[in-house]
UniProtKB/Swiss-Prot annotation:
GO annotations of cellular component type: cytoplasm
Signal peptide: none
Organism encoding this protein: Geobacter sulfurreducens (strain ATCC 51573 / DSM 12127 / PCA)
Covalent S-S links between cysteines: none
Listed name of the protein: Ribosomal protein L11 methyltransferase
């Protein structure tokens, strides 16, 4: 049977988060998680701080949960005054299965066909390719990009329709999935860049797994030399618009820019943001709540 955990959830003043997290790690002997805000950007510059945050801790349910909760309530009561004085809601306890907590995502990651010939295959799953299939083996680790997310899928579909590119730049490479696909589709030179050094390590492992050569860097976009036949950026609307000038400058004459990570409700915002980029919008595709825009440098 799957192991179970008692998930204790505390909503506390933002200033108390670090102190509480340390206390809960000590008390539970396990890690804690702090809920992320749903932001449309990877950059925190100019983002207003929230007043409260949610901290979750994980206990073995066989332990004395009533005793643990009493200790947590005492800790919250002792600290409430120092952090605004408002009463802190009582922690809630939910029983969850281990698979939900740590590795549940693996169940949903099965070999997936995308476009006509691309197949994304988890390293641990068997798969019998059909003639012409381009199989990408992947273990995303903690980096984003299994191909199961619509933003990645939309990018891969758009990339395949553009035929065989020569030079490709993958901005925000994550697991390296788009960069590897570009090589599989025949690109001669591919550069993948990410602001997250851990993502670059995972991307490197995935490139090695697939026997493909991709130059992986953490170099800021503006400092990457040259122009590319295809520039891919599956980031988020705010970031794409902020980077519009640098992204457009990297597209060679006759080349394409594929933008993804855009909630459809933010599509108009991105179209407007690229209005003065000098590129022409040539295709829009959508899946679920996500949009993907393809621009062309007509110059
Ligand atoms: C949504 S993931 C995309 C991963 C993968 N390319 C895919 O399509 O599945 C976005 C990635 O962009 C990276 N990122 C965010 N802002 C960036 C920036 N300004 N320059 C480069 N990478 C960035 C993040 O660290 C993250 O790995």
């Amino acid at each position: 049977m799957d192991k179970q955990w008692a998930e204790v959830c505390c909503q506390v003043p933002a200033g108390l988060v670090d102190l509480l997290a340390d206390f809960l790690v000590e008390l539970s002997g396990n890690g804690v998680s702090i809920d992320n805000r749903a932001l449309d950007t990877f950059t925190l510059d100019g983002i207003e701080e929230l007043d409260t945050a949610t901290v979750r801790a994980y206990f073995d349910p066989a332990t004395d949960m009533a005793g643990q909760i009493a200790q947590i309530e005492r800790f919250l009561g002792d600290n409430a005054a120092a952090f605004g004085g408002a009463p802190i809601p009582a922690p809630t306890v939910t029983l969850i299965r281990d698979e939900d907590w740590a590795t549940g995502w693996r169940q949903h990651f099965v070999p997936t066909r995308i476009g006509r010939h691309l197949v994304i295959k988890p390293t641990w799953e068997p798969f019998a390719p059909e003639p012409g299939d381009q199989v990408i083996e992947l273990d995303p680790g903690m980096a984003f990009g299994t191909g199961t997310h619509p933003t990645t899928r939309l990018c891969l579909e758009a990339l395949e329709t553009l035929g065989r590119p020569d030079r490709v730049l993958d901005v925000g490479t994550g697991s390296g999935i788009l960069a590897i696909a570009a090589v599989r589709l025949g690109a001669r030179q591919v550069i993948g860049t990410d602001i997250d050094p851990d993502a670059v390590i995972v991307a490197g492992e995935n490139c090695a797994l697939n026997g493909v050569e991709v130059e992986l860097v953490t170099t800021p976009l503006a400092l990457i030399p040259g122009r590319f036949d295809v520039v891919l950026a599956n980031i988020l609307a705010e970031d794409l618009v902020r980077m519009a000038g640098d992204l457009a400058a990297k597209v060679a004459a006759g080349g394409h820019l594929i933008l993804s990570g855009i909630l459809t409700e933010r599509e108009a915002f991105v179209v407007e943001g690229f209005g003065r980029s000098g590129l022409a919008l040539v295709a829009v595709s959508r899946e679920g709540e996500w949009s993907c825009l393809v621009y062309r440098n007509e110059g």
